[in-house]
Amino acid sequence: MAEEIEVEETEDFHDMDFNDEEPSCSGGAVQARTERFVVKKWVAHAMWGWDVAVDNCAICRNHIMNLCIECQADPNANQDECTVAWGECNHAFHYHCIARWLKTRLVCPLDNKEWVYQKYGR
């Protein structure tokens, strides 16, 4: 199946009309390539994606990018101090929440697999 697709693509490629002729000099005049189209306006669009399936910490139920309940209770807490921790299972929690959870259980709260830090930070 993949071979058929490749053959079709190359056939389409060969049917395209190219102007590969090099400009030649004849009598001191240089032939310029004619443009087939001119881009008058280009509007770029971007999308931001989040690779975590859930937006909330399953332990404290707050949005993962907001402060956890521990940091909300501390008036001196800084947004940078409340980081996100990812496990090898790709589940994400607030670092403070998962650290408190791991004091009593050494498994992920969602899938009950052994918890191993993959990364943590913003």
Swiss-Prot record:
Residues 1-28 are annotated as: Disordered. Gene3D superfamilies: Zinc/RING finger domain, C3HC4 (zinc finger). GO terms for cellular component: Cul3-RING ubiquitin ligase complex; cullin-RING ubiquitin ligase complex; cytoplasm; nucleoplasm; nucleus; SCF ubiquitin ligase complex. One of its GO terms (molecular function) is zinc ion binding. A zinc finger (RING-type) spans 57-112. Transmembrane segments: none annotated. Zn(2+) 1 binds at residues 57, 60, 94. Keywords: Cytoplasm, Metal-binding, Nucleus, Ubl conjugation pathway, Zinc, Zinc-finger. Zn(2+) 2 binds at residues 68, 71, 82, 96. Its main location: cytoplasm. It comes from the Eukaryota. Disulfide bonds: none annotated. Part of a SCF complex consisting of Skpa (SKP1), Cul1, Roc1B and a F-box protein. Component of the SCF (SKP1-CUL1-F-box protein) E3 ubiquitin ligase complex, which mediates the ubiquitination and subsequent proteasomal degradation of target proteins. Through the RING-type zinc finger, seems to recruit the E2 ubiquitination enzyme to the complex and brings it into close proximity to the substrate. This is RING-box protein 1B. The gene is Roc1b.
